[in-house]
Amino acid sequence: MLSLINHIKGEKIAYLAPAAEGNTWYPNRFIASRASNQPKLDSALATVKGLLDKVKEAGIPPEKTVIMGFSQGACLAVESAARYPQTYGGVVALSGGLIGAEGELTGYEGSLEGTPVFLGCSDIDFHIPVERVHETRDIMSGLGAKVDERIYPGMGHTINQDEMDAVNAIISNLLKS
């Protein structure tokens, strides 16, 4: 994610980018059962929650905070927002979706009222089934988020300029408010 900083436009932005031990946040696919990804999954979510708490304690309110990630980081971004709902400045998932096996995407409560959520993914991403992106869209919308889902034909597991433009739009709107 740090390599994307040069493509994000705006001043007075602080970035917190936690690094996963061994470059992986959890051992199995994000569509595997949550139990199969323990205890790493809970540890990863606690890391994100801890950072969100520190940012808030530093005087930066959630509505000025954007949670963003790519791949496993994208999954953690949307999962964290859904588990710890409040109005955020934005949530960005570049090639990711909510974590858990089919039937486990339940129990999300609270409100993301007005939070802009961007979900960008390829229709042929070998890590991310497009159906999970759609499920994530529906759940985040159900929590009150304003979801912008974009599915890119034939892109694969990468990030494109349109996605970066969407990220910059979220940040630009946030900096204006």
Indicate where each model-derived feature is located.
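Short beta-strand/loop motif that positions the catalytic acidic residue
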Residues: F118-C121, D125
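Serine-hydrolase catalytic machinery in alpha/beta-hydrolase-like enzymes
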Residues: M1-K64
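Flexible "cap/lid" loop of the alpha/beta hydrolase fold
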Residues: P27-R34, G96-P116
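Gly/Ala-rich beta-loop-alpha elbow adjacent to hydrolase catalytic centers
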Residues: M68-G73, A77
